[in-house]
Amino acid sequence: RSTGVRVELGTMVLEVTPDKKIHCVSKEKGYQILEAKSVILCMGCRERTRGAIGTPGTRPAGIYTAGAAQRYVNMEGYLVGKRVLILGSGDIGMIMARRMTLEGAHVKAVYEVQPYPSGLPRNIEQCLNDYGIPLYLSHTVTDIHGRARLEAVTVSQVDERLRPIPGTEERVE
């Protein structure tokens, strides 16, 4: 049944003006100016929860998603930790590694489960290499230590099927 809702998939919004005109572009329709009473922007991205990414161990204070850490540091002015480990080499993770360093934290490393970085090469250079932050590929967190507060994590190398390799565990405090 029709809901009367217009859906524009694969469309990038360029501007929403105060008079409710939506300037957008898509491969299929090109440039358009749409008008609407209400607009719902669905960007196609969301943070995955700890459960969705299968992080082991307990959830003590001191573990943040990239988005939460970004909000605390950039918007609220809080440093979320003095010693930082980042899991995931996406652009936000690398940008946060640099930002945390600039704010005075010691970023131990960025760990990526894949055998290749997932962010842009310029972010590897500008956010990690320029600040001496190591990037470890084919590694993941295999244990979290601490009850009330995070004390340490264990990282392990992974095989080509992304399974931890026994004997490669390293505790990072």
Place the predicted regions along the sequence by residue.
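A Rossmann-like FAD-binding core segment of flavoenzymes
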Residues: 7-18, 22-24, 101-173
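FAD-binding core/adjacent interface of flavoenzyme oxidoreductases
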Residues: 1-83, 160-171
